[in-house]
């Protein structure tokens, strides 16, 4: 009996070490980051991982082997689903959103992106359940003059709020968040 308990304990320890070791290993390729703002009465915090371009085609047609093909849901970062925490009384793209924490997904397109807030949090980024969507909004993109190697989220002030900028390669999606 003691031998069985010892074997089970060893297997549990090895399994946990493997799990946490793999987690740390994968996160070394896409470091975690936090972007937050309290400007213009808008309180937003985004927790995400920053994948790198690494010479890949990021946004484009599926047949061209784009990492995030046009028209397909993307986790908007790497590893776990990106989390966005919103303060009271905010609208995204003109649509009101309750205060709380959501998963942030996007659907890249050639001239616009769809931004999705999903009520399911804590999952791996590829485990998207569209039945839990609480917001879908189209936003414009702009072209950067230089390449952004690591996916980066930052904020720019606009009248009455901020634009949350999703920036990678030469593409930036502008997500208006207003009070």
Annotate the PLM regions.
Residues 1-4:
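Positively charged n-region of N-terminal signal peptides that target proteins for export
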Residues 6-21:
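Hydrophobic membrane-insertion alpha-helices, especially the h-region
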Residues 18-35:
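Aromatic-capped interface at the extracytoplasmic side
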Residues 33-39, 84-91, 166:
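Short acidic-hydrophobic surface loop/beta-edge motif
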Residues 39-66:
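Short extracytoplasmic
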Residues 51, 89, 107-111, 118-122, ...:
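Solvent-exposed coil/turn segments that connect beta secondary-structure elements
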Residues 73-123:
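Mid-length scaffold segments of soluble, non-membrane domains
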Residues 122-168:
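Surface-exposed, gly/pro-biased binding rims or lids
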